[in-house]
Design a protein with these regions (language model features):
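Conserved beta-strand elements of the Class I
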Residues: 5-7
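Histidine-anchored nucleotide/phosphate-binding helix
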Residues: 17-29
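Glycine-rich phosphate-binding loop and adjoining beta1-alpha1-beta2 segment
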Residues: 27-62
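Short acidic low-complexity segments
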Residues: 66-77
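Rossmann-fold NAD(P)-binding glycine/threonine-rich loop
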Residues: 89-164
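Rossmann-fold dinucleotide-binding core
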Residues: 145-214
């Protein structure tokens, strides 16, 4: 298997604040004491990120000796308190298979990293590696807080909690923050004055409440949905707002894959996924991952060498703010992915939900949400039931459950018959053999 694995942070008695150079990965800058270990099996990539981290430390008066870089995670996991996981298993060719094989059958995906054929096969590739990492964490630093940024977030988190239920494993995404910023821009509101309460599942959470300086402004957003200029910018989410009454997280192109309404016919694709990129372009993920690697590495070299200035701005990502709160820096509220266990009362208790959580010294407490509006819970449950069968298939190495997961996937089921889905899955298993564990091929 081919994997990129990076960013393990180890810290003690630290006072953190978060800075983001050029929108890249957030690095915590300590005022007292911190040790940072960076892990990547790609030595070239590890060299770049290590030099960038050293530059950030040096520019902020932090001894660079506190940074360790290694390709061996077990060498640095012992004593770790906070761990970030961001990996990719397989290369651009694996992702190409995720997109192009379903497309031959008529299943048109924009990103394909969350559910659907692409998301589920990404999970099949990624889950064994995540479980290996978590096995080492359970052995070497079982009390660590583990924050996963890897997709498909919900499936991976669910798999880990089934195998390591006591591990403090959480998944973090930025779709809530990004959506809040987009809403503020659409409406001309100051983001700092916007208050919101969001809950659901990853990439399909719902803005349940929306207030501006304490005033309910959801009626204004619903009215704005009929503005053609806004609808053109955010097609599928605005259409769902019109019909379901609530705004959903994640971009319109990504969102279009998680339901049966927008990508099942050419005329619907033309209507609801116009333009390019995140608004629903077919196979857009291949452009994202297929960028000119030489130019990308040249940019990393310019940053690492100091040829390009670093602009320090507060990160949108939750990670460092969560650590700050866990270290006693006050209470911080963030939307975090974790097992439901009654937080959302009309979703299954074992599923992974994305809900408001209160982070304070030494612990993370999910807020009680209660019932989602029925029309929202119904769509979440469609996705959750597919996730659950994918999780069962991964844990049991049972291909039947992968068939079932895609039989009930909202987009796939809207396009294909049962026998077509089965043939597609078999084609994907055969095409991705080099990326998957041998157990999938023994039956």
């Amino acid at each position: 298997m081919k994997t990129d694995e990076n960013h393990l942070y180890r810290c003690r008695k630290s006072d953190f604040y978060s800075k983001t150079p050029r929108g890249s990965c957030a690095i915590a800058l300590p005022r007292e004491e911190i040790e940072v270990a960076l892990v990547d099996i790609n030595e070239r990539r590890l060299s770049y990120i290590t030099r960038i981290a050293q530059r950030i430390f040096a520019e902020n008066g932090i001894p660079i000796e506190r940074i360790t870089a290694t390709t061996d995670r077990r060498a640095v996991l012992g004593g770790s308190q906070y761990i970030f996981i961001s990996i990719l298993v397989g290369d651009i060719e694996a992702i190409r298979k995720d997109i192009e094989i379903p497309l031959r059958y008529g299943v048109d995906q924009c990103i394909g990293d969350t559910i659907g054929p692409g998301g589920i096969f990404r999970a099949l590739r990624t889950a064994p590696v995540i479980l290996d990492i978590c096995r080492d964490i359970a052995e070497l630093c079982p009390e660590a807080f583990v924050f996963n940024y890897t997709n498909p977030m919900s499936i991976l988190c669910w798999v880990v909690k089934e195998v390591h239920p006591s591990l403090r494993f959480y998944s973090l995404c930025h779709s809530v923050q990004h959506t809040a910023k987009q809403i503020a821009e659409y409406m001309g509101w100051p983001l700092e004055d916007l208050e919101y309460w969001v809950a659901g599942i990853n990439h399909q959470a719902w803005f349940l409440e929306l207030r501006l300086r304490g005033r309910d402004v959801y009626p204004l957003l619903r009215e704005k949905a009929w503005d053609p200029e806004i609808a053109e910018k955010d097609t599928t989410r605005v259409e769902m707002l019109k019909h379901l009454g609530y705004f959903v997280t994640e971009s319109s192109g990504h969102n279009s894959e998680y339901n049966p309404w927008f990508r099942k016919r050419p005329d619907l694709l033309q209507r609801f996924t116009p333009g390019v990129g995140w608004n629903g372009e077919t196979g857009f993920i291949l452009k994202l991952y297929g960028k000119d690697r030489e130019s990308y590495e040249q940019e990393l070299e310019r940053i690492a060498s100091g040829a390009e200035p670093l602009s320090y701005e507060e990160s949108e990502e939750y990670g460092m703010k969560i650590i700050y709160a866990l270290e006693g820096g006050g209470i911080f509220r963030a939307n975090i992915n974790l097992p439901n266990r009654g937080t959302i009362t009309n979703l299954p208790p074992q599923c992974i939900v994305e809900v408001p959580c209160f982070v304070e010294k030494g612990r993370i407490r999910p807020a009680f949400v209660g019932d989602l509006p029925l029309q929202l819970a119904a769509l979440n449950r469609m996705v959750v039931q597919s996730q659950e069968m994918a999780v069962r298939g991964i844990l049991e190495k049972c291909r039947d459950y992968i068939y079932y997961a895609l039989y009930y996937d909202p987009l796939t089921a809207a396009v294909l018959s049962l026998d077509e889905i089965k043939r597609m899955v078999d084609d994907m298993f055969e095409a991705e053999r080099e990326y998957l564990p041998n157990e999938w091929y023994h039956s």
